[in-house]
Regions:
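Short terminal alpha-helical segments
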Residues: 1-35
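Amphipathic alpha-helical packing elements
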Residues: 43-65
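Residue-level signal for secondary-structure boundary elements
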Residues: 24, 28, 55-59, 70
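Amphipathic alpha-helical binding modules
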Residues: 66-106
């Protein structure tokens, strides 16, 4: 089955500090409040990943996250689904989990 990460406040803070310039941290943290859905921390982590350290891209990701949170999560956690015909289902799940954890735990 597909890997579903558990994301904590500490994880979000760690990812922010790791992937974004220090001078942007307060601005980015202030945007977290706009995410009001059930999977809030998971969506914030996905936005951080998808934006790749770019604050403007992060803002764009976050601006659609409440309405399109599944797409946001899918882009971050399950990028191989778009190329599904190239892989077996097990390969897709294994590789997606591997790529997400590689980013999440570095």
């Amino acid at each position: 089955s597909q890997y579903t990460p558990t994301v904590t406040e500490e994880d979000v803070e760690r990812l922010l500090k790791r992937d974004y310039l220090r001078e942007t941290h307060d601005e980015i943290r202030s945007l977290f409040i706009s995410v009001t859905i059930r999977e809030r921390l998971r969506v914030i982590a996905a936005c951080l990943k998808n934006a790749g350290g770019d604050v403007e891209h992060f803002k764009a990701q976050l601006s659609t996250a409440n309405g399109y949170w599944r797409e946001t999560i899918s882009e971050a956690e399950y990028p191989r689904v778009k190329r599904a015909s190239q892989y077996t289902e097990t390969e897709i799940h294994d590789k997606q989990r591997e790529q997400y954890l590689s980013w999440f735990e570095r």
